């Protein structure tokens, strides 16, 4: 049995291949919070910090877009432009929101929150003024203090399987993980509960309950949330180039599960 402890402050960056596809291309933000812009060969993934009682959105796109609420609590409003239909709901993390083309949405933070948007298109938007006016009014209601942020990129790591970006928000760890086709990640278990959110691609996900030695597996082709319980061995196998998020509280510690870890290492050695 091997225990791995990962210190984000001292993590060494390794670069074995030059064909990695996910990059942090820029960062920005305002008094509402920080924005991180990531780009792969086909996908844009943008992280938005949204401080309590502020709003983002108020526009629509001519392409589908997916939002993932990673941390916090929001009110989410959706307005279908071809009808009178409007949906208003409160959501707590983790949650996945799929927005169809020409559908306006508005996100109002109930607590300090972190969400991402992802899409496969050149960015373009048009204002939906009823929602956009709410964004403007929320800005007017609060005194704009000096920019500060709870969202940070702590480190990054790269090997033949792809890149990992280590983020931290409000004391919780969020890792954006790339998984190349025919490679595997994981092969271990934790003493803590973790969340894995598959964003894009196609992944075969394996779990083994160590108490009963029973295995389950499934193929994931759409965004999906996986709650991984303590002492459940798990592994991700890339059927296509894929991306997912891992989140957890506290110090990272993993204990290898040999049956899965052998697969991870064999795929890396090929």
Predicted regions and their residues:
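A short, N-terminal "cap"/entry segment at the start of jelly-roll beta-barrel domains
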Residues: 5-44, 132-173
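Double-stranded beta-helix
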Residues: 23-25, 83-84, 108-152, 213-214, ...
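Conserved short histidine dyad/triad with adjacent acidic residue
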Residues: 46-61, 175-190
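Short beta-strand His + acidic residue motifs that chelate non-heme Fe in jelly-roll/DSBH
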Residues: 56-58, 76-77, 99, 104-110, ...
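Glycine- and acidic-residue-biased ligand/ion/polar-headgroup-sensing regions
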Residues: 63-77, 192-208
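Short acidic-glycine-tyrosine-enriched beta hairpin
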Residues: 81-101, 210-230
């Amino acid at each position: 049995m091997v225990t791995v402890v990962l210190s984000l402050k001292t993590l060494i960056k390794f670069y074995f291949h030059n064909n990695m596809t996910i990059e942090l291309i820029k960062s920005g933000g305002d008094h509402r919070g920080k924005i991180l812009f990531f780009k792969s060969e086909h996908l844009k993934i943008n992280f938005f910090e949204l401080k309590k009682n502020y709003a983002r959105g108020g526009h629509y796109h001519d392409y589908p877009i997916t939002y993932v609420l990673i941390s916090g609590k929001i009110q989410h409003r959706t307005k279908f432009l071809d009808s009178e239909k409007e949906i208003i709901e409160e959501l707590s993390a983790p949650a996945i929101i799929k927005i169809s083309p020409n559908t306006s949405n508005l996100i109002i933070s109930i607590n300090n929150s972190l969400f991402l948007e992802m899409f496969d298109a050149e960015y373009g938007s048009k204002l939906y003024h009823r929602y956009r006016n709410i964004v403007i009014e929320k800005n007017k209601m609060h005194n704009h203090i000096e920019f500060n942020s709870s969202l940070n990129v702590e480190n990054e790591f790269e090997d033949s399987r792809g890149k990992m970006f280590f983020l931290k928000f409000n004391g919780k760890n969020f890792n954006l993980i790339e998984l190349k086709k025919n490679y595997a990640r994981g092969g271990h278990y934790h003493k803590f509960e973790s969340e894995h959110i598959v964003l894009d691609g196609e992944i075969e996900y394996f779990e083994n309950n160590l108490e009963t030695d029973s295995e389950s597996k499934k193929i994931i082709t759409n965004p999906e949330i996986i709650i991984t319980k303590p002492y459940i061995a798990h592994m991700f196998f890339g059927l296509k180039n894929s991306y997912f998020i891992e989140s957890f509280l506290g110090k990272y510690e993993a204990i290898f599960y040999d049956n899965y870890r052998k697969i991870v290492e064999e795929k890396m050695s090929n």
